[in-house]
Design a protein with these regions (language model features):
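Glycan-processing catalytic domains of CAZymes
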Residues: 15, 21-287
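Alpha-helical interaction segments
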Residues: 6-7, 36
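Hydrophobic membrane-insertion alpha-helices, especially the h-region
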Residues: 7-18
């Protein structure tokens, strides 16, 4: 009797397996990961102003859109996500913009970066100040901003702008401190917000030496052939980013400001994502 029971159970198990195998709809499938979706991106946009019905429809055609969540209306964000677009929200990491009064008015004096003479660094073009990422108070403010602007609005990830300021504007000894603090901050984002996807703008050495294991894509602005096509430093960075992508899956999103055809061809040669923005580093116009 026991043998008959075992045979019946085995036959039933095989029948159930065959039914499931021949009916794919019955088989639960793992959702595509953020990294896989980013690797498959064909069309993306970086846009930091308000939306309208026309822009909202264009967003739905994109694989990835980076928006200013303070400006972009929630209805357009959600509609684009429903069509499969990834939406990342802009957060200015190493600068404080005076236009963002709600955040700016919460800053303390120790949150601002100061040089050896105690002088702040002001960027006239953007009406912003360089910040000190080693400030625990400043990190807490940014985490609150990410909660309010990214997590609460259901965005797919956070895009940290101005990370490259560390390499570009600070002396070597200060770079180490700020890079270590940036790494700590990004780890906090991951811990606080259930592994939220994080991207960064510029900061190639920061990426290579510190943040790569936690960054899903890096942006390279002015990836224009006349700037990078035959430049030794740029070619070295291209190779470095390819190595990082192979090791960590970090995608490279490039933006060309000139020479669209050649710039796009160079990006595609290295399997970088590309879009053309003749307005340069101003992203307040969709076209």
């Amino acid at each position: 009797m026991r043998k008959i029971y075992i045979i019946i159970v085995a036959v039933l198990s095989i029948c159930i397996w065959l039914l499931l195998t021949n009916n794919p709809k019955q088989i639960p499938r793992a959702s595509t990961s953020i990294k896989e979706k980013l690797a498959a991106v064909k069309d993306y946009k970086y846009y930091l102003d308000k939306g309208n019905n026309t822009i909202g429809k264009e967003m739905q055609k994109m694989d990835l859109v980076i928006v200013e969540p303070i400006e972009m209306q929630q209805q357009y964000i959600e509609a684009a996500q429903e069509q499969g677009a990834l939406i990342y929200g802009y957060i200015n990491a190493m600068e404080a913009d005076k236009w963002n009064e709600t955040l700016y008015n919460q800053l303390q004096e120790d949150d601002f970066y100061k040089d050896e003479y105690g002088k702040k660094m002001y960027f006239d073009e953007w009406d912003s100040y360089l910040m000190d990422m080693t400030s625990a108070h400043y990190q807490d403010l940014l985490l609150e901003e990410i909660q309010k602007q990214i997590v609460d609005k259901g965005l797919d990830g956070v895009f940290l702008d101005t990370v490259g300021n560390i390499d570009s504007f600070l002396p070597p000894e200060e770079q180490v401190k700020q890079n270590q603090a940036m790494l700590t901050f990004i780890k906090k984002i991951k811990q606080h917000y259930n592994g939220l996807s994080v991207a960064q703008n510029w900061g190639f050495q920061t990426l290579a030496n510190y943040t790569a294991p936690y960054i899903d894509f890096i942006m390279w602005e002015n990836f224009s052939y006349d700037v990078v096509g035959e430049d030794d430093w740029s070619l070295e960075k291209i190779a470095q980013l390819e190595h990082i992508r192979e090791k960590f899956g970090t995608q490279v999103m490039t933006i060309g400001f000139s020479n669209e055809t050649q710039s796009r061809a160079l990006a595609e040669k290295h399997h970088f994502k590309f879009f053309y923005n003749p307005a340069g580093s101003y992203y307040n116009s969709w076209h």
